[in-house]
Every structure is written in structure tokens, then in C-alpha cells.
């Protein structure tokens, strides 16, 4: 994890009627946590090419949520990565990749599945800061009577060169230095489709190229010092699940259906291993 930072999720005023759905129905500001990480299951230097993850947890969101047993929680999660499409096109490929990673032998899986290996190689990259790339939902979500994908895009991109001799966790250091000097913002956008063919929902390796992304909110990361032992533990113990959401934004497709239980099991395993209770924060001041 590069850092878990304090942010505000600010729904835009004056949205077009077709965008005023669920979470975006009214202009409003939510306290949020934004956790940046590498996607690799193995601990590796930040200078190595990888997918980067951005997990966003909004707090104080009213309304019933879809995740079993957490219907009354007041959080809403978004999970995004630094590539627009996923490595696996269906649950079978997703399960095979997951088992290979859990067994510590993804290389053998890639050798047996060259198409997935090619997708992996085209999706990873090197970045000078977690604030540099755009992040995507990859999978599709309901948007009332339409289907949406999400994007988190820097409002004003900044140059972030990779150091000539980067430290093991230089992305954390870069994020710390940047947020010590001031705030930073991302635009939160949706890409909408009406009645897409099932394959464009089920196959997460397919990009939607024709529909524009439209801004619905802004994510304002506050100026702060997040690099403390307590915040590191807090961030590592946060749980994210795409099904912790309002019904208007229901996750769609086989990959999302699989993530519902896979992510819950991974969260339970991590919290048991760390002897940490799993709680959903209600505000910035709520540390569980």
C-alpha cells in the first residue's frame, strides 16, 4: 500500500437529468478514504512495472446497500485500477488466475495462457506517483436503467518523473511529498451505455470505445501527512467490496458476481491473520 489518504467526494451541481442517479442524484459532499496500492500480490519494488489500484470508500451515504449482512452500513465503495480492461474475460479465467497467484506461481499460469499473459503485459506500467495515472472500474455497473463504467482521472495532470535511483517504496514517498505541499484532485467520470450486448458486460477484456466519459463528481485529496504507523495499519485493515453500494449502482457481469464472495473471503482472511476487527468507518474520526 502506498498510502490511505483523506479525501472529499463532491457530487457536481447542475448535472444533466440522465446523470442524476443514486449517489449522484443531488449535489453533496462525502468524507472519504482513498487507498493507493500496487496490484501485485507479492511485495516488490515500486519501480517495477505493475497495475496500480485506487480504492475509494465514501462515508455517510444513506440508503440500503447490496452487500449481504451490511445492508445498513453507511459506506459506498469504488474499486479502480490503472487500466481500462481486465486480464480475465470470464469467471473461469479469473478463478484460474486467482488460484495461481495464491499458489505463488502466476508465471506458470501465464505460460499456459498466453492471451492472458499478453493482456497482463499491455496493462502494467511504471509511474512516478500514485497521482499520475487514471484509474478505471474495468467491470460494468448499473446506472438506473443503463450500464456504466467509472473512471478516476487527474483534474490537472502533473509531471512525476521516476527517480534515477528509486527507493523500494518511492511511490509512498512521492505521494507524501506531494500532499505535504497542497491538495490534489481527481475528476470522477461515468461512461454510459443503453442496452449493450451481453458480451460487452460479461467480457471485461472488451473496451467501450465509442461512448464519452462524463464528469459527475470531484475527489479532492486534502493536504495532509498520512505516513504514520497508525494510518498504515488503518489503511491495511480497510475492507473494499464493489457490492458495498446502492442498488442503483449494482455491479454487473460474472467477474463482479465472483468478486462479491472472493473479496469478502480475502478480507476475512486478512483480518483474522492480523487479529484485527473488521469495521466500516462512519467518518474520518472513526477509527474503529
Where does each model-flagged region fall?
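Active-site-adjacent core segments of small-molecule enzymes
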Residues: 1-288
Amino acid at each position: 500500500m502506498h498510502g490511505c489518504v483523506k479525501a472529499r467526494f463532491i457530487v457536481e451541481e447542475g448535472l444533466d437529468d440522465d446523470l442524476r442517479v443514486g449517489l449522484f442524484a443531488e449535489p453533496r459532499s462525502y468524507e472519504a478514504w482513498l487507498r493507493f496500492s500496487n496490484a501485485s500480490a507479492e511485495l516488490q519494488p515500486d519501480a517495477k512495472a505493475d497495475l496500480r489500484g485506487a480504492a475509494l470508500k465514501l462515508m455517510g451515504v444513506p440508503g440500503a446497500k447490496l452487500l449481504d449482512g451490511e445492508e445498513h452500513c453507511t459506506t459506498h465503495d469504488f474499486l479502480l485500477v490503472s487500466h481500462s480492461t481486465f486480464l480475465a474475460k470470464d469467471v473461469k479465467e479469473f478463478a484460474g488466475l486467482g488460484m495461481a497467484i495464491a499458489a505463488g506461481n502466476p508465471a506458470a499460469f501465464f505460460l499456459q495462457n498466453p492471451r492472458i499473459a499478453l493482456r497482463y503485459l499491455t496493462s502494467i506500467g511504471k509511474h512516478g506517483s500514485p497521482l499520475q495515472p487514471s484509474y478505471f472500474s474495468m467491470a460494468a455497473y448499473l446506472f438506473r436503467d443503463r450500464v456504466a463504467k467509472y473512471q478516476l482521472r487527474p483534474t490537472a495532470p502533473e509531471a512525476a518523473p521516476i527517480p534515477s535511483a528509486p527507493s523500494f517504496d518511492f511511490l509512498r514517498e512521492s505521494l507524501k511529498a506531494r500532499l505535504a505541499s497542497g491538495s490534489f484532485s481527481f475528476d470522477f467520470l461515468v461512461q454510459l451505455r443503453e442496452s449493450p450486448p451481453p458480451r460487452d458486460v460479461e467480457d471485461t477484456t472488451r473496451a467501450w470505445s465509442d461512448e464519452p466519459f462524463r464528469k459527475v463528481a470531484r475527489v479532492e485529496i486534502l493536504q495532509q501527512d498520512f505516513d504514520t504507523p497508525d494510518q498504515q495499519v488503518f489503511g491495511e485493515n480497510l475492507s473494499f467490496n464493489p457490492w458495498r453500494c446502492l442498488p442503483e449502482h449494482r455491479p454487473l457481469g460474472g467477474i463482479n458476481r465472483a468478486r462479491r464472495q472472493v473479496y469478502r473471503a480475502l478480507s476475512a482472511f486478512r483480518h483474522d491473520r492480523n487479529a484485527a476487527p473488521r469495521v466500516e468507518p462512519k467518518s474520518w474520526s472513526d477509527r474503529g
